[in-house]
UniProtKB/Swiss-Prot annotation:
InterPro entries the record matches: Aquaporin-like, Aquaporin_transptr, MIP
Chief site of localization: membrane
GO MF annotations in UniProt: water channel activity
Keyword Membrane: yes
Record membrane topology: Multi-pass membrane protein
Annotated protein name in UniProt: Aquaporin-1
Top-level lineage group: Eukaryota
Biased segments, Basic and acidic residues type: 410-425
Function (record text): Water channel required to facilitate the transport of water across membranes. Involved in conidiation.
Motif (NPA 2): 323-325
Subcellular location: Membrane
């Protein structure tokens, strides 16, 4: 009879747990069902690693699953990413700790079957694609938002100027010029309605600016970042050229929508008209759209009406640009820039500066306190919402004035009991809805209480 070595045995011995355990039968069922039994060891392979049987005292068996009562998780369920046990050549199960893993990596270079054994099941486990990390980062990046805003501004500005240019072409079909009141009203209504509709559509995407002067004003107010402002200005100029090309190619009449000075209008007069009308338009945008209030969602109506009124005044004298992009497109596609073209750039930019300056002035003077409650919006009313910055500033000023009038310095140590009591009283007061005229009485009473407390402390010390 020929003796066979354990290394050349076609049928390896079944997996056996350690005889030291009291649960050999329960664990043996799981070991016999393990998928690693489907990978028999190769023949005539020299065993380089010393096999180590399972020692249950070094292995903490996991708890039962909550989904299936009485179910013990398999080896793959315990360690889904790392195979903790390998079937050695002689039928034992070896523990794959850090040293054995390093040995297996070295051994896999000379034994390809071992590398396949380590990766075959792992490939099946990773059939489901991992999340696209780069795509997720891109979706959360600022540049993605800039691109969305640029696309919205491109389409919105193109539509706004397309309808405006087309309205001018329709108004001039009978050969009459803007001094005609009907033509003047038609052009003004077309531009005003076009801005109202397109701004209402795109203000949630890009802000619905459609005007480099408006973009500059919002950048000064830090309502738009400098990078986005630059991208939007370039987009608005390109959209004006696109709108002019569409009107020129679609309508049979020759394109005649360029802005020029009216007869008898000097450059200085045209410059002032453009600056004033643009300032009125931008200030309307700031107060209705930038300054949030109860009626912000209907701001496009007021903005469109402001443009309509400005066109009614400025069209006979300057053509009513109020927008550098509106004058740039028709002149750029035919490459014909008149001598007074600078007016339609410098005038609106100056108007934007005037609007921002006036807004900063009234904001510094806290215009909210001049006539509060006009919107019927308690959240933006400083007399009803003490959480507003304006209301808190008023509290601090009044408290400081009352403290100085009583001969006490407001700039005291915060660790003093009087200062802490004052802060607690102010916090309790700001949580209520009391009227503004009662603040003086409240703080005056607090000062009296603090004075009495200090006198009592002095008497105790003496």
């Amino acid at each position: 009879m020929t003796m066979r070595s354990p290394l050349t045995n076609d049928h390896p011995q079944p997996l056996r747990a350690s005889p030291l355990s009291e649960h050999d039968d329960e664990i043996q069922i799981r070991l016999d069902d393990s998928r690693y039994r489907s990978f028999p060891p190769p023949r005539r392979v020299v065993q380089r690693n010393t096999p180590a049987p399972i020692q249950l005292q070094d292995f903490e068996f996991p708890k039962q699953s909550h989904d299936i009562p009485g179910h013990y998780p398999m080896i793959d369920e315990i360690y889904p990413d790392v195979h903790p046990y390998r079937t050695s050549e002689d039928g034992f199960v070896s523990l794959t700790n850090g040293d054995n893993m390093a040995q297996n990596k070295r051994a896999s270079r000379s034994r390809p079957w071992m590398q396949n054994l380590q990766t075959q099941d792992r490939i099946q486990r990773y059939k489901k694609r991992r999340p696209a990390t780069k795509w997720m980062k891109w979706m959360n990046s600022d540049w993605k938002n800039h691109i969305v805003a640029v696309i919205g501004e491109l389409i919105g500005t193109s539509l706004f100027l397309f309808f405006g240019y087309a309205g001018i072409e329709v108004a001039k079909l009978q050969g009459r010029e803007p001094p005609d009141l009907e033509v003047l009203f038609y052009i003004s209504a077309t531009f005003g309605a076009s801005l109202m509709v397109t701004a209402w559509i795109f203000f949630r995407i890009s802000g619905g600016l459609f005007n480099p002067a408006v973009t500059l004003a919002l950048a000064i107010l830090k309502a738009v970042s400098p990078i986005r402002a630059f991208l939007l200005v370039i987009t608005q100029l390109g959209a004006s050229c696109l709108a002019a090309i569409l009107v020129q190619e679609i309508f049979p009449k020759q394109l005649d929508v360029a802005t020029t000075l009216g007869s008898g209008t000097s450059m200085g007069q045209g410059f002032v008209i453009e600056a004033i009308t643009t300032a009125a338009l931008i200030f309307t945008i700031i107060m209705l759209a930038v300054e949030k209030h109860k009626a912000t969602f209907v701001a496009p109506i007021g903005i469109g009406l402001a443009l309509f009124v400005a066109h009614m005044v400025a069209v006979p004298f300057t053509g009513a640009s109020l927008n550098p992009a509106r004058s740039f497109g028709p002149s750029a596609i035919v490459w014909n820039f008149p001598r007074e073209h600078w007016i339609y750039w410098v005038g609106p930019i100056l108007g934007a500066g005037l609007a921002v300056l006036f807004f900063r002035l009234i904001k510094l003077m806290e215009y909210e306190m001049a006539n509060p409650g006009q919107d019927g919006d308690p959240e933006n009313d400083p007399t009803q919402n003490p959480e507003l910055d304006v209301a808190q500033n008023a509290h601090e000023r009044e408290e400081e004035v009352l403290g100085l009038s009583n001969g006490k310095s407001w700039y005291r140590d915060d660790s003093s009991s009087g200062s802490m009591r004052r802060k607690e009283s102010v916090n309790s007061f700001t949580g209520g809805r009391r009227s503004m005229d009662r603040r003086g009485d409240i703080f005056r009473r607090l000062d009296d209480v603090e004075a009495q407390w200090r006198r009592q402390q002095y008497r105790n010390v003496v």
